[in-house]
A protein has these predicted regions:
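Mg2+/Mn2+-dependent nuclease catalytic core
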Residues: 60-81, 89
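Acidic-basic catalytic patches of nuclease active cores, encompassing PD-(D/E)XK
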Residues: 1-33
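Short acidic/glycine-enriched loop/turn segments that link adjacent beta-strands
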Residues: 37-40
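Conserved catalytic cores of phosphodiester-cleaving nucleases, focusing on short active-site segments
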Residues: 23, 42-63, 79
Length: 123
């Protein structure tokens, strides 16, 4: 592993810790971290009241595209596939769900609620 990749992973892991703390401060229940499904990975899964929230965490150390902008349509589809997998596995089909992005750049943490709509087949 080269230094940039290692630094990026450490930065991403620290960002996920900060994002989780933000959600806990907002009284969300954390259900899963780094959930892996076939062809998908979801950084955080939380519950906000009755809503299941699938969260993509984007940590930026340099300026450039915002976290929301860097969650491409393909990435959204993968997150949605992972969300369906999680909900089926845990008997949550039919529950309300949403997709949030948490952007972290320096000391600024921005929680974008409903950052993108469901991208995939209707189940």
């Amino acid at each position: 592993m080269d230094r940039d990749t290692g630094a990026s992973r450490r930065s991403g892991a620290l960002g996920e810790v900060r994002a989780e703390q933000l959600l806990r401060d907002k009284e969300y229940d954390i259900l899963a971290h780094n959930y892996v499904a076939p062809g998908a990975e979801i950084d955080l899964i939380a519950q906000d009241g009755a809503v299941i929230v699938f969260v993509e965490v984007k940590t930026r150390t340099k300026s450039g595209a915002s976290g929301r902008e860097s969650v491409t349509r393909e990435k959204q589809r993968r997150i949605c596939r992972g969300a369906i997998h999680y909900m089926m596995k845990h008997g949550l089909m039919g529950r309300q769900a949403r997709f949030d992005v948490i952007e972290i750049q320096g000391t600024r943490v921005t929680h974008i609620v409903n950052a993108f709509p469901y991208q995939g087949p209707m189940v």
